[in-house]
């Protein structure tokens, strides 16, 4: 077996050049790949959040007690967002937070497009810039809807990066307020290297 390192965001386009590839959902879904149909192996997801590669939302250490940021995290950890992840990202993204899997879902195949198309106004709201990677970030529209429904007066502005290491740099420099493309393993390594 010959292993060839390739940038994660280019993996789907190289499938014709290799016998197989390890591609995460961030890049597989926009390319039209479906795990149950196209995968040779699917990594088992640990829904209790113990998987060190589950994405988490992080802020700078100085901002760890910021109430606005905590409100965003709380909005992300809602039943509506869990349902959106499950319905919109078939087989690819799973909530790594508690939700009621047995509940009658309000998000369905028939109305998920309404959330994908949800638009909010940033007028008179606190704008929070959230760093993301890849093309699968529509769950943030569901988060925005939760915030708007709660009258939180917060507007989420997504800042998209094309490489996984760039959001950390942008967070550290203050270009973004939160990094939503961060896993525990990478965060621990980055903290060990950069403090």
List each model region and its residues.
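Short, polar/charged alpha-helical segment
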Residues: 130-157, 165-166
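Short helix-initiation/N-cap motifs at beta->coil->alpha
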Residues: 2-13, 158-169
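Beta->alpha turn/N-cap motifs
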Residues: 18-19, 23-29, 135, 162-164, ...
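Immediate post-signal peptide segment of exported/extracytoplasmic ligand-binding proteins
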Residues: 103-130, 148
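Extracytoplasmic/secreted envelope proteins and their assembly/folding machinery
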Residues: 12, 69, 73, 82, ...
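Ligand-binding "clamshell"
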Residues: 31-44, 189-195
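A bilobed periplasmic-binding-protein/Venus flytrap-type ligand-binding module shared by bacterial periplasmic
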Residues: 52-71
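Periplasmic-binding protein-like
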Residues: 75-99
């Amino acid at each position: 077996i010959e292993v060839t390192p390739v940038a994660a965001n280019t993996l789907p386009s190289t499938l014709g050049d290799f016998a197989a590839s390890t591609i995460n959902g961030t890049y597989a879904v926009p390319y039209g790949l479906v795990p149950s149909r196209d995968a040779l192996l699917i990594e088992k997801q640990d829904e209790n959040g113990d998987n060190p590669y589950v994405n988490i939302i992080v802020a700078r250490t100085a901002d760890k007690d910021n109430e606005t940021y905590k409100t965003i995290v709380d909005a992300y950890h809602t039943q509506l967002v869990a349902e959106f992840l499950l319905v919109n990202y078939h087989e690819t993204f799973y909530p790594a937070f508690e939700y009621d899997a047995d509940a009658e879902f309000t998000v369905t195949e028939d109305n998920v497009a309404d959330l994908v198309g949800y638009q909010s106004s940033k007028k008179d709201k606190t704008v929070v810039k959230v760093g993301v990677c890849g093309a699968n970030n529509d769950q943030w529209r569901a988060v925005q809807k939760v915030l708007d429904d709660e009258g939180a007066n917060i507007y989420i502005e997504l800042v998209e990066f094309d490489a996984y290491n760039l959001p950390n740099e942008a967070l550290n420099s203050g270009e973004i307020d939160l990094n939503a493309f961060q896993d525990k393993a990478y965060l621990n390594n980055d903290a060990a290297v950069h403090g």
